[in-house]
Amino acid sequence: LLHRVENYRFRDWKDIKHDSDIYNGRLLHNRVGYTLSEKLPMLMGLRAEPWFGTLEEELIQKIPEEGISRNDLFSDYPKGKDNAHIQRSLKSALSNMERQLVVAKQFVDVPNRKRSMAIFKRLHGKVKPLPFDKALTELISRIGPVRLHTLRLFVSRPVEELADTLRELERRGSIARVVALQPDPTDYYSSHEDAERL
């Protein structure tokens, strides 16, 4: 990314990481990344409706508006060797919520502490996801031209739904399909502006 950024100093990272507009979460294909709060509706719109077990339901109700640390979130549950299975279940439930972008983290600088403190913020029910077709159009305009195979890394919906939505967006004129030879003909999806430049 550095070749795309001007006047960036590595010491600026701390300011970026602790900015209240920056979220850390499993954004793409279960990989952890950082994004701006304004991009959350698009990223959430690319995902299917989240699935909740009873433990996930319980945990999400405990997250206040201002967020909560993991220690505080788990504080009401028994600890120790005898309860290791409970702690494993809690970590698994929280990880499941992160994977589905139900929650994301923000980092807070705490005085006299070497590392930043991670605060879990609830996104589900607080941030309204874009409809899938709009989220897909926005994604393509940001990263296109892009192949179907690459789009699958960003979308956690069935590939059939993705292919149907791409066909519908192309039919509506929201996106363009460009065929490139590499060496076989390959479909790329892009905005009309990008398609004209190619």
Where are these regions (language model features)?
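Long, low-complexity intrinsically disordered regions
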Residues: L1-L198
